[in-house]
A protein has these predicted regions:
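Short, solvent-exposed coil/turn elements at secondary-structure transition points
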Residues: 9, 78-80, 141, 151-154
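Domain-level recognition of soluble alpha/beta enzyme cores
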Residues: 118-149, 153
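Generic beta-sheet signal
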Residues: 3, 97-108
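Short hydrophobic/charged patches on amphipathic alpha-helices used for structural packing
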Residues: 38, 89-92
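Active-site-proximal alpha-helix that buttresses catalytic centers in soluble enzyme cores
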Residues: 2-82, 122-123, 130-133
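Structural motif
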Residues: 81-89
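Extended, charge-rich low-complexity interaction segments
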Residues: 108-115, 158
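Glycine-rich phosphate-binding loop signature in dinucleotide/nucleotide-binding domains
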Residues: 43-45, 94-99
Length: 158
């Protein structure tokens, strides 16, 4: 069983955005990254697409939703500022029901999920934090993540 954790694609400068941050959209670069992520995961057997409520996260999953015919579900536990254990537990509950989830979240939540999983015994292959549009492929066995593989962003940004 797999869980795919995706950091949202490039959304431009937070400081240059003068509206509510959760409404900040993807940049043209981010749109390209989102398409590349979708191409990489289109045949990964994903059953559900989970997103933070933030627009940039939802937009990151739109090309994957189009490729798979799935709807993007907003999951509050993935919102920026949330903690790792509740997000990880929600993802593991879905995996326990046999669902493969691709979840898009933020640069604080994703590393917190990874840190929680490694504290619980998962082996991490790659960095603890990834750049925008980077992702982790998590292997689940016996109700826990056992292995986490970091996949760099599709445009090679580090």
């Amino acid at each position: 069983m797999k869980i795919h954790l995706i950091r949202h694609a490039h959304a431009g400068s937070r400081s240059a955005w003068d509206k509510a941050d959760h409404k900040r959209p993807l940049s043209p670069r981010g749109e390209g990254q989102a398409k590349a992520v979708a191409a990489a995961l289109a045949d990964a057997g994903i059953d559900e697409l989970w997103s933070s409520p933030s627009l940039r996260c939802r937009q990151t999953l739109v090309p994957l939703a189009e490729a798979t015919g799935l709807e993007v579900q907003v999951v509050d536990v993935l919102d920026e500022g949330n903690d790792g254990p509740p997000a990880l537990d929600a993802l593991l509950a879905a995996a326990a029901e046999g669902r493969v989830v691709a979840a898009c979240s933020h640069g604080d939540v994703i590393p917190a999920v990874v840190a929680t999983a490694t504290r619980r015994g998962a082996e991490l292959e790659g960095p603890r934090a990834i750049s925008k549009a980077g992702r982790y492929v998590c292997t689940v066995a016996d109700g826990q993540i056992t292995h986490i593989l970091a996949v760099p962003p599709p445009d090679g940004d580090t």
